[in-house]
UniProtKB/Swiss-Prot annotation:
Top-level lineage group: Bacteria
Enzyme Commission identifier(s): 7.-.-.-
Gene name, Swiss-Prot/TrEMBL: ecfA2
Entry GO CC: ATP-binding cassette (ABC) transporter complex
Alphabetized InterPro entries for the sequence: AAA+_ATPase, ABC_transporter-like_ATP-bd, ABC_transporter-like_CS, ABC_transpr_CbiO/EcfA_su, ECF_ABC_transporter_ATP-bd, EcfA2, P-loop_NTPase
Xref: NCBIfam families: ECF_ATPase_2, PRK13646.1
PROSITE patterns in the record: ABC_TRANSPORTER_1, ABC_TRANSPORTER_2, CBIO
Record Gene3D superfamilies: P-loop containing nucleotide triphosphate hydrolases
Family named by the database record: Belongs to the ABC transporter superfamily. Energy-coupling factor EcfA family.
Binding residues annotated for ATP, in chain numbering: 40-47
Protein name, per record: Energy-coupling factor transporter ATP-binding protein EcfA2
Assembly with partners or alone: Forms a stable energy-coupling factor (ECF) transporter complex composed of 2 membrane-embedded substrate-binding proteins (S component), 2 ATP-binding proteins (A component) and 2 transmembrane proteins (T component).
Length: 287
C-alpha cells in the first residue's frame, strides 16, 4: 500500500479560543515495503501525523491517498474502516489496552470486529508469540499475570497477527529491558524484509533509528523539515542540536575519536560492524 499526503493540515479545536495547528501543509509519500522513522522533539506533530495513517484523524485541509481511497475532512468513517484493517497502529504502552482474561480471547477481538478469519489470525499470533519466547500454552494464559514486557509483546502481536500492509509503531520499546527491545525490533525488521511490509517507527531512540530505518522523516513545529537517509541525517552536526536530535552512540564514538586524534573519517558508520571496518582501515592507513 502506498500512502500519499497532499498538502495536509490538521487543526485541533478549530474555531475555538484553543485552536491549535498541529500539522502544517504536510506533503509526504510512503512507499510500500520501506522502513521509515519519524523523529522530532515532543510537540513536533509526530503523534498527530501517525493518527492520519489509518484514519483515526482526518485532515482539516488537504487529503490523503491510500491506493484506491482518498481521505479528506468529509470522508465518512464507514469508508475508512477498510484502511484500519490494512494499517496497524501500535500506540505507546499498548499493554494498557489489554482487557480480555486470556490471550486467546485478546487475539480474537480485533479480527472478529473486522470480519476476518479468526483461526488464521490466531495461528499467526501463536507463531509470533513462540518466536518471542512464550511457552506453547501461551493462548490459555492471562496477560495480567505476566510482566509488563510480556504484556507489551502480546499487545504488539495482536496487531501484527492481523497481517496489516503498513505497521505504525509509536515508541514500541519504551520501558522494555534491553533483551526485549532487541527481540521486538528484530521482529519488525524481519517482517518488513520477509513480507514486504511497510514499517513506520516513531522513536526518540536514535540507536534504533540508525540501525533499522531506511529513511528518516524529521518533524518540527508541525512541519516536515527533512526526509533523508540515516547517514545523511546524522552527518548534520549543528542542525541536529537545533532540532534536539541526539547522535546514535556509535556516531558519537566516531566524533569523539575524530576530536581526540584530530582526524575526519570519510563517512559515518551506523553499526558496530561498519565502525570496526572503518576504524581498522584508518589504523592501517596510519601505519
Amino acid at each position: 500500500m502506498k500512502i500519499k499526503f497532499n498538502d495536509v493540515t490538521y487543526t485541533y479545536q478549530q474555531g475555538t479560543p484553543y485552536e491549535y495547528k498541529a500539522l502544517d501543509h504536510i506533503n509526504l509519500t510512503i512507499e510500500q515495503g520501506k522502513y521509515y522513522a519519524i523523529v522530532g522533539q515532543t510537540g513536533s506533530g509526530k503523534s498527530t501525523l501517525i493518527q492520519h495513517f489509518n484514519g483515526l484523524l482526518k485532515p482539516t485541509n488537504g487529503n490523503i491517498e491510500h491506493d484506491e481511497l482518498t481521505i479528506h475532512s468529509k470522508t465518512k468513517d464507514k469508508f475508512i474502516r477498510p484502511i484500519r484493517q490494512k494499517v496497524g497502529l501500535v500506540f505507546q504502552f499498548p499493554e494498557s489496552q489489554l482487557f480480555e482474561d486470556n490471550i486467546e480471547r485478546e487475539i480474537e477481538f480485533g479480527p472478529k470486529n473486522f470480519g476476518m478469519n479468526v483461526e488464521e489470525v490466531k495461528e499467526r499470533a501463536f507463531d509470533l508469540l513462540l518466536e518471542l519466547g512464550f511457552p506453547r500454552n501461551v493462548m490459555s494464559l492471562s496477560p495480567f499475570q505476566m510482566s509488563g514486557g510480556q504484556m507489551r509483546k502480546i499487545a504488539i502481536v495482536s496487531i501484527l497477527a492481523m497481517n496489516p500492509d503498513v505497521i505504525v509503531l509509536d515508541e514500541p520499546t519504551a520501558g522494555l529491558d534491553p533483551k526485549s527491545r532487541q527481540q521486538v525490533m528484530e521482529l519488525f525488521k524481519e517482517i518488513q524484509l520477509k513480507q514486504n511490509k511497510t514499517i513506520i517507527l516513531v522513536s526518540h531512540d536514535m540507536n534504533e533509528v540508525a540501525k533499522y530505518a531506511e529513511e528518516i522523516i524529521v518533524m518540527n513545529d508541525g512541519n516536515i523539515i527533512e526526509q533523508v537517509t540515516p547517514k545523511e541525517l546524522f552527518r548534520q552536526g549543528s542542525k541536529l542540536e537545533e532540532w534536539h536530535i541526539a547522535l546514535p552512540d556509535i556516531v558519537q564514538l566516531q566524533r569523539d575519536i575524530e576530536i581526540k586524534h584530530g582526524i575526519k573519517f570519510k563517512t559515518i558508520a551506523l553499526t558496530e560492524k561498519e565502525f570496526v571496518s572503518m576504524y581498522q582501515e584508518w589504523q592501517h592507513h596510519e601505519e
